[in-house]
């Protein structure tokens, strides 16, 4: 949601969530205890567990690229407590949780008793104002000083206190603040101008004069505000204002000459005007409308005298919290809550888009594209029709019709939606949306102007930069999370509407603390697994076959950056070891290495064709060096596959791969067949081996295989052509990119669509492997090395 955003009464879990400090309880991690726990893991982890057990002491002592001090881990119990607190807050979601608005509260406080008596209709609002003045005499966000925010909140509160002649000391202190700071208006970043400020603040100045307050209305700092007001009012078509729901309904209190009979046709079902307290209070003062009174009475009672900027905001909150949990790498802990939120969003989806609440009469592009992307990625069918409502005749995409300037964050969310959730056969609007948003963001990036009109976030520029540099197809989950840990502002992020406001549920320190603790645990496990993998490579003399520590590290990184859950070590290491062995065999085949003999390849195929037990009993048939490769393959097949059926499946997969390798002169290993071998290995190591059984494959599985093989083959052939410098033309490269993009859309549709025949995690395996190929093709070796360092070895602080 953009520019519209209310606090739910803090539940116990939410209150605890807010009280969590950024500090992290740290204790020394008990590696021997972890080794004992691993020893009790299921037997099919086999050599993976044994390697980790044997490497644990060395892994503690050996700290390559980590530095002199190693980050101490969160106790599992403490992480579980944080997960429990977050889960409770997610399950207690109501109308939305944002902070209160002194400005809106002041407008409600101005409503006189409707029964004809003296005094305010809502005296609790006066009490709230008196109790929430800041030490400098102002009202507003206490952690971020924006001149406009402090002035509009403070002046509104001063007017309310003066109107009822109460708390004169607070009134005078607030008035002094206004006089002292009005000259500072030009200091604010133009991108951060409050919505409607140019019409609302001059209105407040006139109201202040009417109640006898001395106002510096001729201050030079106000001249620009007056000019913007006159320009905006001249541009507003009064007929549209009174007949079509627009964002202007948020600022009715700053609009002259309103026709209330016509405007009430735009009143929301809950009695408000666009679910906002200030325009609703103004309408109540002007008309005495009972539905306005009911809305305000409910709000003020619910929040004990305070009024939020807008309420409810439950649709906005539910969508955004899913996005934050996924990007922080925490989604696996909250599957049920995420599913519930998206089911709610889908119930209220329309082809005209969505807004910040289910009954919102004004849809915005930000909520719409965030919902569009997340719903599609979770198997819901949503069409592209909604995007057309935000495309202008000039080919631009806007948050609202009639907006005065563009939003960086909204265009970034539009780009993410068009990049990540485009399917074959989509209307051209998706392609146009991607092209427009990409061009806009690149232009703002080039000019160094990535501050946004809707959110104040120090991490937004780097977030946008990373998103533009790494399109979704080449963006690995754990790399994205590692970057987002530095971009996610937590409770420091401030949203801009008519006032500054904060969304407590999805911008808080507990989310950040939990995500960092979880990622640190992941890093510790990766370092242990890497030590085991490196030792395994050394034991089997794989360096003799061209496997360097760097190439083995890269193979492990690609696996861990995709499959990162703590209980999926077998899948990670199965992927990594398969990639390493495939590289070793390919190197032998393609080089003049003395060990790369025809007899060895024939022997490998022969062993795979046999009953599967000869590998362990081959005696002196091969040299010690050759035995290393056979040993490695033997361990992978017989020890990582749980049960004879699984090992037979994996043996058959290797046989197929080897035969394709010999048939195609070794080049095929760079692409599709190796990718399918990785997929089948991951599935077998996970225990989901029935899906990889050639005789049990449903049609959808075959389609996933076909697309994965095709994409990875194209990327592999492109890499080979670059290495061989065979004169590939730019046109050919562009054609190849277009084909890959088209097939990636097909693969995404196959993976995301909801089907019961194949599990979601199995479909994700195809996507993980394919995106890893895209990532390697997209990234320079230096970039990959920097990501390895950041994801695995650089402590999260």
Predicted regions and their residues:
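Terpene synthase/cyclase
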Residues: 1-797
